Amino acid sequence: MRQIAFYGKGGIGKSTTQQNTMAAMAEMGRRVMIVGCDPKADSTRLILHSKAQTSVIKLAAEKGSVEDLELNEVLVEGQWGIKCVESGGPEPGVGCAGRGVITSITYLEEAGAYENLDFVTYDVLGDVVCGGFAMPIRQGKAQEIYIVTSGEMMAMYAANNIARGVLKYGHSGGVRLGGLICNSRNTDREDELIIELARRLNTQMIHFIPRNNVVQHAEVRRMTVIEYDPQNSQANEYRQLAKKIDNNEMKTIPTPIRMDELEELLIEFGIMEQEDESIIAKANATS
């Protein structure tokens, strides 16, 4: 069984990419479980055709404790037999959502949810790699990390920060960076830029996903593109990504870059002009 995690900046399309890729993986015959580690609890909606799956934390609060839960209450089987779980989190402004991730994964392990699987995938909130959200990395639950990014500055900034988190635990545990997934925003020279960022981070751009409105059309119907329009070229993009992950042999300890190196990269590719340096300088001063 391989345990992988998808990290990335909020709004980058991480959950959509993960669900479409795992749908393609299941279509290939792989036995898959998705564990949502985002308080929004939207990591499984396209597989289950639902607004949001009831989370482990919410059910535990209703029942009294996690120990009072039955596995079939929190683990739901969706399209292609994909097993789905949402860890959930507290109400906004109350408590640490990262603790929900820790509680949920511990419960799933003890309840035997990880048996007879080929892939377990964690969909993790990734603007910041705080202790709770880093739990799949920190405790070696996820062995392979895939960072969803784009040619936009803040998406690359987040990718570099996540790479720092992987590096921190890469030597002490078995976690490795499997690659960058470029979820295109149609920015200038985007594929070249992410290939170069990947090179500097000692990894690969494992796949470039072009922008296609069919993704939004499928999402509105709470479906993956694989299910909504299986013959569409975009469905084949996700199938290609699934095959690349399935066969991926390049798993590395990353080499995060400094903020001034990221700045130089953006200038080199014409994304940022010299006069914009103050933006990066301010970010650098607070990082």
Swiss-Prot record:
Its EC number is 1.18.6.1. The keyword Secreted does not apply. Signal peptide: none annotated. The reversible ADP-ribosylation of Arg-99 inactivates the nitrogenase reductase and regulates nitrogenase activity. Coiled coil: none annotated. InterPro entries: NifH/chlL_CS, NifH/frxC, Nitrogenase_Fe_NifH, P-loop_NTPase. PROSITE patterns: NIFH_FRXC_1, NIFH_FRXC_2, NIFH_FRXC_3. Its cofactor is [4Fe-4S] cluster. GO terms for molecular function: 4 iron, 4 sulfur cluster binding; ATP binding; metal ion binding; nitrogenase activity. The modification ADP-ribosylarginine is found at residue 99. GO terms for biological process: nitrogen fixation. It catalyses: N2 + 8 reduced [2Fe-2S]-[ferredoxin] + 16 ATP + 16 H2O = H2 + 8 oxidized [2Fe-2S]-[ferredoxin] + 2 NH4(+) + 16 ADP + 16 phosphate + 6 H(+). It comes from the Bacteria. Gene3D superfamilies: P-loop containing nucleotide triphosphate hydrolases (3.40.50.300). Keywords: 4Fe-4S, ADP-ribosylation, ATP-binding, Iron, Iron-sulfur, Metal-binding, Nitrogen fixation, Nucleotide-binding, Oxidoreductase. ATP binds at residues 8-15. Belongs to the NifH/BchL/ChlL family. The key enzymatic reactions in nitrogen fixation are catalyzed by the nitrogenase complex, which has 2 components: the iron protein and the molybdenum-iron protein. Homodimer. This is Nitrogenase iron protein. It comes from Frankia sp. (strain EuIK1).
